[in-house]
Amino acid sequence: MIEPLNRPTRLLRFVAGLARWSLGCLLALWLLLAVAWGALHGWIVPRIGEFRPQLEAQAARALGLPVRIGAISARSEGLIPTIELLDVALLDAQGRVALLLPRVVVAPSPRSLLNWGFEQLYIEHPDLDIRRQADGRIAVAGLTFSETAGENNAAADWLFSQGEVVVKGGRLRWTDELRGAPELALENVDVLLRNGSWQHNMHFAATPPPAWGDRFTLTGRFRAPLLRARDGNWQHWSGQLFADFSRVDVSRLRHHADLGVEVAQGRGAVRAWADVQRGQIVGGTADLALTEVNATLGPQLKALVLPSIQGRMGGRRLAGGFEFYTQGLQFQTDDGLVWPGGNLRLQHTGAAGKAPAQGDLRADRLDLAALAQIGSRLPLGAAAHSALQTYTPQGLVNEVHATWRGPLETLQQYQVRGKVTGLALAAGAREAGNTLPGLSGASVDVEMTQAGGKASLAIASGGLVLPGVFEEPVLPLDQLSAEVRWQVDGPRLAVQASNVRFSNADAQGELRASWRTSDAG
């Protein structure tokens, strides 16, 4: 019996035809590249000098500036030839030389020539002057550009469409007339720029004046939007920028960058990462190892003076709020207090529609004495400044977690859980003339809200401060343990203590106690 042959289906015939068509296109492309490669090596390279006018005209169209080439030569070695240009001059509107490049080496390929570009562009010993004028316009080697002219900047689009750009041994002078800053001259400037269709990777290294510090590097990895391939406008890019300063005088950066704080002094090493979205910095992280720091963190605040500080700090913008954190941050105050290197993460978002403002705080190893010492120099708000001044806290917060709703100045709801050792609080006055008790030498495990809370209290070689209870307000204690609860009702406060066991030089015993503010007012 003869079995009938299976005839190919319409789908199989379509797939086979598509495969043949794709193979033909691929072969045609390879043939085109082979012809272009042969023309490049066999016709263009030997006659490169004859193409100088065309190269000048094409460069002028790409950059939007007149271009003159002093001399040109080419070598055909390997698959990709190299073309050397000497004394390349960019001219201003009056025909004067605005920028002179002593030596430029380009490596074209058939693929790059289809886009009127190069596989690699090498620039040696350029001398560049960049100036931001008082009206905000940028002048590069005497050629003026608007800061907002990135949408149709032909020179930038061409530069960021090249496969690789290398600058070696350059010199850069930056003058900011808008800020009134002194000129900054950078020597031995090296730049490496690699571009893909949507990717832009760059590396910048330079040596500043000796008073600024040592040689530093900047590294960036950015991507353009999906529908903006080879977009030269950096205001559309997103990615990350990394800076590495092995030794820098931070106070000098304030003349050229908005740091958000006034830094009068500070020297040491800084490594920083900045997150960028559509050309705007939205967050960042910095590793610090600085000495002799003198900074003012806000208006009407005292200067913060730290003989030394090291650790990691970071933050980012949130919708209507912010996030700030530290990791292993250690510092010493000018009064000799030492911050022990704890971690902190603070997040606060503003009100949006019917949702109120809210926040979250997590921290460990917080030195309350150091915090009280520098509290007036930190932007904590009037309520926190007043509390630190009134209660002068001491002790180590082993861990704390706090959440809240409402503005920081007038919290609507809050919840706090924490453990503190070596706690000391001064007695403080409340509204209506009442006074809160104080304590010293305490270890506390606490949970509290705006309506009240509870705490496990243990005191060793400490005491209680009870204004108005005894003739001598300070009650010394060798040992004390207690379970404490309290309730808050507006200005009124009620406290109950159970399972209280105590001993001192005069007495020992167990008791239950309660205390409350008066009902006056």
Residues covered by each model-derived region:
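Extended terminal
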Residues: M1-C25, H236, Q347-T349, P407-L411, ...
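Amphipathic hydrophobic-ligand
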Residues: P66-R68, Q94-P108, R179-V191, P210-P225, ...
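Outer-membrane beta-barrel proteins
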Residues: P108-S112, L226-R228, V276-R278, H348-G350, ...
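Solvent-exposed beta-strand/coil patches in large extracellular/periplasmic or lumenal scaffold regions
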Residues: T144-R179, G196, H203-T207, R271-R278, ...
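N-terminal type II signal-anchor transmembrane helix
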Residues: I2-L63, L128
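Secondary-structure transition motifs
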Residues: I2-R13, L65-P66, T82, L86-N195, ...
